[in-house]
From Swiss-Prot:
<keyword id="KW-1015">Disulfide bond</keyword>
<feature type="disulfide bond">
    <location>
        <begin position="41"/>
        <end position="54"/>
    </location>
</feature>
<comment type="function">
    <text>This necrosis-inducing peptide induces a hypersensitive response on Cf-9 tomato genotypes. Race-specific elicitors are compounds which only induce defense responses in genotypes of host plants which are resistant to the pathogenic race that produces the elicitor, but not in susceptible genotypes.</text>
</comment>
<feature type="disulfide bond">
    <location>
        <begin position="47"/>
        <end position="61"/>
    </location>
</feature>
<keyword id="KW-0843">Virulence</keyword>
<keyword id="KW-0732">Signal</keyword>
<feature type="propeptide">
    <location>
        <begin position="24"/>
        <end position="35"/>
    </location>
</feature>
<feature type="disulfide bond">
    <location>
        <begin position="37"/>
        <end position="51"/>
    </location>
</feature>
<feature type="signal peptide">
    <location>
        <begin position="1"/>
        <end position="23"/>
    </location>
</feature>
<keyword id="KW-0960">Knottin</keyword>
<protein>
    <recommendedName>
        <fullName>Race-specific elicitor A9</fullName>
    </recommendedName>
</protein>
């Protein structure tokens, strides 16, 4: 009985701390992965020769 209680507590601990780790790491990952340029875009080929591709959610060219 004690073993199963311990595993439940451990699972709860992991479940509560893991989202915090993801929330802390997410902006860092996005900052590294998406380097926004000054160019705005509305079409896929607006960013050719500048930054790579168009992020249609932000309407900006990204590397």
């Amino acid at each position: 009985m004690k073993l199963s209680l311990l595993s439940v507590e451990l699972a709860l601990l992991i479940a509560t701390t893991l989202p915090l780790c993801w929330a802390a790491a997410l902006p860092v990952g996005l900052g590294v992965g998406l380097d926004y340029c000054n160019s705005s875009c509305t079409r896929a080929f607006d960013c050719l020769g500048q930054c790579g591709r168009c992020d249609f959610h932000k309407l900006q060219c990204v590397h």
